Regions:
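Membrane interface segments of multi-pass transport proteins and intramembrane proteases
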Residues: 27-30, 95-99, 143-151
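Cytoplasmic juxtamembrane interface segments
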Residues: 47-67, 139, 197-198
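Juxtamembrane helix-loop-helix connectors linking adjacent transmembrane helices
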Residues: 57-127
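Alpha-helical transmembrane segments in multi-pass membrane proteins
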Residues: 5-56, 103-104
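Structural signal for membrane-spanning alpha-helices in multi-pass inner-membrane proteins
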Residues: 18-22, 44-51, 80, 84, ...
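Membrane-helix interfacial "entry" motifs
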Residues: 3, 28-32, 61-65, 69, ...
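Transmembrane helix-loop-helix hairpins at the membrane interface
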Residues: 116-219
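Alpha-helical transmembrane spans of integral membrane proteins, capturing the lipid-embedded, hydrophobic core
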Residues: 11-19, 37-41, 45, 69, ...
Length: 219
């Protein structure tokens, strides 16, 4: 019961900061950037604590059957990259000059007063951990026990994509299709393997190098 309450508190805090404050009220400026970064770090740490059993299980699964988990890790990476290439090609065909609002906001963030190390920790490490906790461990892991995975996984992927969008326009939607496919691949992988560290590791690996390169280019 206590763990269920903690998960609900984590979800509520995530919704308040990243949906209501950022998407609905649309608070802007460096104040909200600091809020987002601190929320990612603090809620990411809280997510590690709340889902510590799931993370420990993932680590144990690597010890029990390392070859199986390596194959799933590689397969998940290849599937994610392949679907991302296809969806990016669709954007290239339909909107070749469009740059998503999220890409612009990330580049602007590294020109703000927020230190690069804070941005990298928030967006490259704790942000991915928090998002995996919400969309995979909480939604897919919990809801698929009561609702069909064929419903839960696509819905979770759709929500994951929607939370990264900054406008309800077709170009913005098309530019974020890779997020939907990533959510599908990560959701299926977690549901089948029960290993949370695969999607967490890939999510961090997907974000961290890009952020470091942006920080270097802006410096």
């Amino acid at each position: 019961m206590e763990k269920r309450i903690n998960k609900s508190i984590l979800l509520f805090a995530y919704v308040v900061v990243f949906l209501i404050c950022v998407k609905v009220i649309r608070i802007r400026g460096e104040g909200i950037l600091w809020t987002q970064c601190l929320a990612y770090i603090l809620l990411g740490l809280l997510a590690v604590y709340i889902f510590r059993d799931e993370i420990k299980t993932g680590v144990k699964l690597w010890k029990i059957n390392p070859i199986k988990n390596v194959l799933w890790l590689i397969g998940c990476f290849i599937a994610d990259m392949g679907l991302n290439i296809l969806s990016n090609y669709l954007q290239y065909v339909l909107y070749p000059d469009y740059i998503s609002m999220q890409e612009n906001s990330i580049e602007r963030a590294f020109s703000s007063s927020v230190p690069d190390i804070v941005l990298i920790l928030a967006l490259g490490i704790f942000g991915p951990i928090l998002e995996e906790a919400i969309y995979r461990l909480f939604l897919v892991g919990n809801l698929s026990k009561k609702i069909s995975s064929f419903i839960v996984i696509p819905v979770s992927a759709l929500l994951f994509m929607a939370m990264h969008m900054n406008a309800l326009t077709l170009p913005e939607l098309i530019s974020h299709l890779p997020k939907f496919f990533t959510g599908l691949v990560y959701g299926i992988t977690y549901k089948v393997t029960k290993n949370s560290t695969i999607s967490i590791g890939l999510h961090v690996f997907n974000n961290l190098p890009t952020l470091i390169l942006i920080a270097i280019s802006v410096a």
